[in-house]
């Protein structure tokens, strides 16, 4: 999908780029698959802030996406390719032979009019979903489950893909986009292919207002704050913070490991970032 630039009639347009949405076939979503998205502004029920940098943004409705791909043995035709404001990838509306309609993530190469299938007997074709035990080693997959039947939790953002490296007993070895190699139960579902909208990572936001449309508020550095607001705050004039980087709550950051989940350590074969 090509990226367009703008004639710099304002300073922000000089650096701003955007996707050419020539792959989108309709701007009218399927209403039965829309639900209202309640916005919190980063605040909990008591009204105090729990997530910084959240708030504002354009109103959105959630599209109900089929992450389980559990409609086995029923062929579905791709009716439309649509924009989804809640994710980086495009979504495809699938019209099944029994009349039901569902949204799925659009993989690279999936076009309107194509037919897809889910289930152990499905062919190894882009958009088809199968258990990992039925997928040959070396295949590129996305939309991967961590627990059978729970629905996909990994490899769902634009341009993402994992590679099925091998199968050992009850587990399949997957090379994830982060570089991590992980064991996943062999009965978990995965979809063939790479998630679409691969040029998403090449878009330049260009201006602060475009992030505000998304509901992302400004991020201030700790050294610009007062001591009451951040451990790096205060000092006479510009300072370096005077200590190693920490979060606003005093925990070391920038490379400091905080992961503490021994229960799933056994499933990680190679950590991300390591050869």
Curated annotation (Swiss-Prot):
GO BP: cytoplasmic translation
Record-level Gene Ontology MF annotations: rRNA binding; structural constituent of ribosome; transferase activity
Residue span of region Disordered: 212-259
GO cellular component terms, A-Z: large ribosomal subunit
Pfam family of the protein (one): Ribosomal_L2_C
Keywords recorded for this protein, A-Z: Ribonucleoprotein, Ribosomal protein, RNA-binding, rRNA-binding
Assembly, per entry: Part of the 50S ribosomal subunit. Forms a bridge to the 30S subunit in the 70S ribosome.
Its biological purpose: One of the primary rRNA binding proteins. Required for association of the 30S and 50S subunits to form the 70S ribosome, for tRNA binding and peptide bond formation. It has been suggested to have peptidyltransferase activity; this is somewhat controversial. Makes several contacts with the 16S rRNA in the 70S ribosome.
Official protein name in the record: Large ribosomal subunit protein uL2
Species for this entry: Acidobacterium capsulatum (strain ATCC 51196 / DSM 11244 / BCRC 80197 / JCM 7670 / NBRC 15755 / NCIMB 13165 / 161)
């Amino acid at each position: 999908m090509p990226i367009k630039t703008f004639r710099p009639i304002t300073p922000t347009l000089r650096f701003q780029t955007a996707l050419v949405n020539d792959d989108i076939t309709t701007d009218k979503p399927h209403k039965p698959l829309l639900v209202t998205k309640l916005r919190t502004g980063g605040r909990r029920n008591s009204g105090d802030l729990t997530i910084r940098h959240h708030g504002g943004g354009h109103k959105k409705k959630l599209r109900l996406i089929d992450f389980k791909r559990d409609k086995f043995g029923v062929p579905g035709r791709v009716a439309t390719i649509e924009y989804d404001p809640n994710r980086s990838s495009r979504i495809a509306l699938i019209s099944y032979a029994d009349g039901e309609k569902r949204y799925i993530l659009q993989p690279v190469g999936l076009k309107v009019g194509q037919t897809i299938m889910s289930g152990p007997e499905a062919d190894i074709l882009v958009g088809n979903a199968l258990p990992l035990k039925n997928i040959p080693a070396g295949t590129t997959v996305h939309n991967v489950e961590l627990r059978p039947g729970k629905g996909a939790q990994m490899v769902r953002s634009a341009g993402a893909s994992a590679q099925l490296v091998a199968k050992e007993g009850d587990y399949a070895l997957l090379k994830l986009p982060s570089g991590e190699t992980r064991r996943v139960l062999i009965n978990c579902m995965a979809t063939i292919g790479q998630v679409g909208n691969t040029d998403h990572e090449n878009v330049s936001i260009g201006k602060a207002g475009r992030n505000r449309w998304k509901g992302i508020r400004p991020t201030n550095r700790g050294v610009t704050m007062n001591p009451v607001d951040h451990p790096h705050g205060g000092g006479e004039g510009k300072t370096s913070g005077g200590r190693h980087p920490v979060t606003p709550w005093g925990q070391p950051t920038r490379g400091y490991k905080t992961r503490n989940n021994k229960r799933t350590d056994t499933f990680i074969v190679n950590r991300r970032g390591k050869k």
